[in-house]
Amino acid sequence: MSTKDVKELAIEQAKKFGGKLEVCPKVPIETKGDLGIAYTPGVAAVSSAIHEKKERAYELTTKKNTVAVISDGSAVLGLGNIGPEAAMPVMEGKAALFKRFAGVDSIPLVLDTQDTEEIIQTVKFLAPTFGGINLEDISAPRCFEIEQRLIDELDIPVFHDDQHGTAIVVLAALYNSLKLINKKIEDIHVVINGGGSAGLSITRKFLAAGVKHIIIVDRTGILSETDTGLPPHHAEIAKLTNREHRTGDLATALEGADVFVGVSAPGVLKPEWIQQMNEQPVIFAMANPVPEIFPDEALAAGAYIVGTGRSDFPNQINNVLAFPGIFRGALDARAKKITIEMQIAAAKGIAKLIPDNELTPTNIIPDPFQEGVAKVVAESVGNAVKETN
């Protein structure tokens, strides 16, 4: 099916159904007796019970299984700053995926503000309704402060999926790739092309998982702590990376590298640069819809494993493998935060969905529709909560 066909079908579907979601009651409302229990006068007893003990909201309302999907429409994938109304279909889609893959109810909310303080305060005002907050398509660097402030100030899980979802799945793909190329995580050299929210989150996940040698390349070149003109979020990560203090461009960074991770722009990875990498190079080219290099070009240049963000190529790095199960696990465990330990556990859970004897260079990551993905991720997250409590 062509891209044109998909776009036309998406418009037709949206017009036919008036969006992707509806609200349906769980309880019967067929008689006056039903009405008296579901609404007045019976509902007063439920409200009184929660008033006496606020925690009973998890037991007596939808809070325990409901997540807010919140965006300001400032950084919608492939579309940019399109505003709240235009972002709504994306948030609806996200909410539909939560339900389809993990049974999590979610409400899409788009905010008509791009002011950091206004977003933080609005989410805090809305938080009593929800068991968790999924932030979506909020531009960097504002997204870093918004997420961190909400994590610090709320007692429910807050997760910016654009940062962490893809990073978790890339880490899962890395775990399985290392099994095939027989290299240890602490020995590999990784180049991450893209210094935005996804690139920085991937860097932090890799560091936490044991990767010791990482170089980040942004549009200005290799990030180095010797550069005094870096913005704060780059200066902080530069202290943890580029141990060799390299300077230069992507080609320089890739000399002797084992893994390339691209969250950047179409066509920026040249085939000849792959030839400068170590034996059996691993390429994760995740720019969408056009990757940093197409798989056939990368393989012809000597790549051993290639993953992209696209469903029409092998090894799709798709964050739908992560976020439904992560929230399922966090909600079930009543976690107050989604910690780095929980995120690494999720990556390991995704990786183990493919048995070692089934791993091949074109099969390093499970399909989102593989049965039990969200369940395994949720269990992995839940176990991490137990281990850290």
Predicted regions: what is each one?
Residues 235-305, 310-312:
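Rossmann-like adenosine-cofactor binding region
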Residues 161-162, 285-389:
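Adenosine-phosphate binding glycine-rich loop
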Residues 1-158, 384:
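N-terminal ligand-binding/catalytic initiation module
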Residues 108, 134-137, 158-161, 192, ...:
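General beta-strand structural signal in soluble alpha/beta enzymes
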Residues 77, 82-102, 160, 168-265:
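Glycine-rich phosphate/diphosphate-binding loop of Rossmann-like nucleotide-binding domains
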Residues 15, 58-63, 99-100, 125-127, ...:
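Solvent-exposed alpha-helices and their adjacent loops that cap or buttress functional pockets
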